[in-house]
Amino acid sequence: MARDIGLNVPVPEKDCSDVNCPFHGTLPVRGQVITGKVVSDKMTGSVVVQRDYLHFVRKYQRYEKRSSKIHAHNPPCLHARVGDMVSIAECRPLSKTKTYVVVEVNRA
């Protein structure tokens, strides 16, 4: 049985036994919710999400494109792949670089 994580995202149909799954495990989510594109899924149980944004350059009064890469935990019930648009939510630190978890996947 999936639990309510407090975000307006659909509950995955597939079940999993991952302890770090926000729906089927005990991982609480809080803080930021970010959307981005999965650029790598080669790590076991993790994905790299690229977030694009605009940065204002005051000298030229223009915007420039920038991007950042965020490592996120990928629960087996969601199974995000390269090219998918995902929503990731902030959680407690899961490792040295992972402090986000995938909560929604929009297949590409």
Curated annotation (Swiss-Prot):
Keywords: Ribonucleoprotein, Ribosomal protein, RNA-binding, rRNA-binding
An example molecular function term from Gene Ontology annotations: structural constituent of ribosome
Entry's Gene Ontology BP terms: translation
GO CC, any one term: cytosolic small ribosomal subunit
UniProt signal peptide: none
Transmembrane segments: none
InterPro entries attached to this UniProt entry: NA-bd_OB-fold (IPR012340), Ribosomal_uS17 (IPR000266), Ribosomal_uS17_arc/euk (IPR028333), Ribosomal_uS17_archaeal (IPR019978), Ribosomal_uS17_CS (IPR019979)
Gene3D superfamilies for this protein: 2.40.50.1000
Keyword DNA repair: no
Keyword Ribonucleoprotein: yes
Residue stretches in coiled coil: none
SUPFAM superfamilies: Nucleic acid-binding proteins
Quaternary state and interactors: Part of the 30S ribosomal subunit.
Function of the protein: One of the primary rRNA binding proteins, it binds specifically to the 5'-end of 16S ribosomal RNA.
NCBIfam families the record matches: PRK08572.1, uS17_arch
Entry similarity comment: Belongs to the universal ribosomal protein uS17 family.
Name of the protein described by the UniProt record: Small ribosomal subunit protein uS17
Source species: Methanospirillum hungatei JF-1 (strain ATCC 27890 / DSM 864 / NBRC 100397 / JF-1)
Gene label: rps17
